[in-house]
Amino acid sequence: HIQNLRYIQGGVNMTEKILKNNQAVVAGEIISDFEFSHEVFGEGFYFVKLRVNRLSHSSDTIPLLVSERLIDVTHSHIGQYLEAHGQFRSYNKHENNKNHLVLSLFVRELEFIDSMENRKPNMIFLDGYICKEPVYRTTPLGREIADVLLAVNRAYGKSDYIPCICWGRNARYAGNLSVGSRIQLWGRIQSREYQKRVGENNV
């Protein structure tokens, strides 16, 4: 969910931008146990779910990908509060002959906290390139919205593909941008739970 965005001209210095072009911080309550994801050179990485409250009293469930070297993954931490800093990442998971884009926050630093007081629980900054024609539309209630797929460069020639949503004047602005445009955006990470209609009577 994008709150502010900016169009950038010119190239990007990869050595300076590898970490700076994708920054996120979330704070909330752990609501799951750890689920093994993968191992790199003997270091295990695990998924855990964090519930992050919005100002509107609803909440988002954000998957964290965390190293066993940052937290004791053999114990349950359900009900504890955590602040995590890292990068929002994506990968394609092949399941039932379909590709599914999996999004998670790759945690670089974390801290257990006593409460959410004076915390800004959900912020993200991305600097990347539009890799699909933006889709601008109006909702049935008259709200302007634009879908943007952003490619954010990572080290070793990899990229993360992050679907973003803009509202209002940001939606109008983003709807006129072309593929290959470099933009910077500030916003929040949002879980997208929706019902998809697959037939006349089925959702």
Show the residue positions of the predicted features.
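Single-stranded nucleic acid-binding surfaces, predominantly the OB-fold ssDNA-binding core
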Residues: 4-203
